[in-house]
Amino acid sequence: MSDAVLLLEQARFGLRGGFRNTRAVIFTIIFPIVLLVLFNSVFSGKNGTTRFQGVRVDFASYFTPGIVAYSIMLTGFSGLLIALTTNRERGLLKRYRGTPMPSWVFLGGQILQSVVMVLIMAIVLIVIGSVAYDVHLRSGALGALAVYLVLGTATMCALGIALTRVTTTADAASAVGPFVTVILGFVSGVFIPVSSLPNWLEDLGRVFPLAHLAEGLQRCFSPAATGNVLDGSNVAVLAAWGVAGLVIAVRTFRWDPQGAGT
């Protein structure tokens, strides 16, 4: 069996297990949908608009792609961090490495699984946004949307794998992953419009990749946004974080449980 077939089988196996895991379904699918409905219902009932890149846009067109970005981080970063750390602690990663399957196929399958989950989740959220809140993709933005989804997922996965070096136990991963994701959600223009943040907090948020992923996706759906949909600075920051995460992951990833030999 070729490595490519093994990669697809590994992703399929992971997807099947993920959909059977109640906690994973709640965490990566139901939770983002609840957030989407709550934010759009609460904020759309105020004045109905917020400021985005100097123009007024309706809340639904702002929050819907923001929640998509947040779900990418939930799945690619936090979800993968927790899954890998838990499987390592149980000794499953060590067993995988002892099989003839190349190591990169296992990790690649995990990333491919996350990409598929993100695409499914993005479609669900966008359909809900379109049907319930009249949110629509900008003309000619489909290609940019695909780039942001794939690049954003790859970046978050790379960072999630890299952080497994620090989260030596499943409990630590279950605390660190959601904590980082929630904090960045507040400072990256996901939960609170960027125009409502203090300048220093906005600047802090833009250091991290979630702000650029959220802004990129928001540009894809904002009818009043100007300029190119595929913004070079957002893509560059996401790519830089992805490369940094990949380098750290390659150099520091551990297959053995805490306390085992290297």
Go through each PLM region and give its residues.
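Hydrophobic alpha-helical transmembrane segments of multi-pass membrane transport/permease proteins
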Residues: R20-K46, A60-G79, L119-A122, V180-G185, ...
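Short hydrophobic, aromatic-rich alpha-helical segments embedded in or entering the lipid bilayer
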Residues: S2-R12, V190-G232
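Aromatic- and glycine-rich beta-strand/loop motifs that create alpha-glucan
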Residues: M1-F31
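Junction motif at the cytosolic side of a transmembrane helix
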Residues: F221-A225, A236-T262
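Alpha-helical transmembrane segments and their short interhelical loops
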Residues: S103-V182, G227, D231-A239, V243-V247
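Transmembrane helix boundary and interhelical loop/hinge segments in multi-pass membrane proteins
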Residues: G18, G76-M101
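Short helix-capping/hinge motifs at transmembrane helix termini and TM-loop junctions
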Residues: F39-G48, G129-L137, T167-T168, I192-L197, ...
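Transmembrane helix segments
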Residues: I30, V37-N47, T164-A211
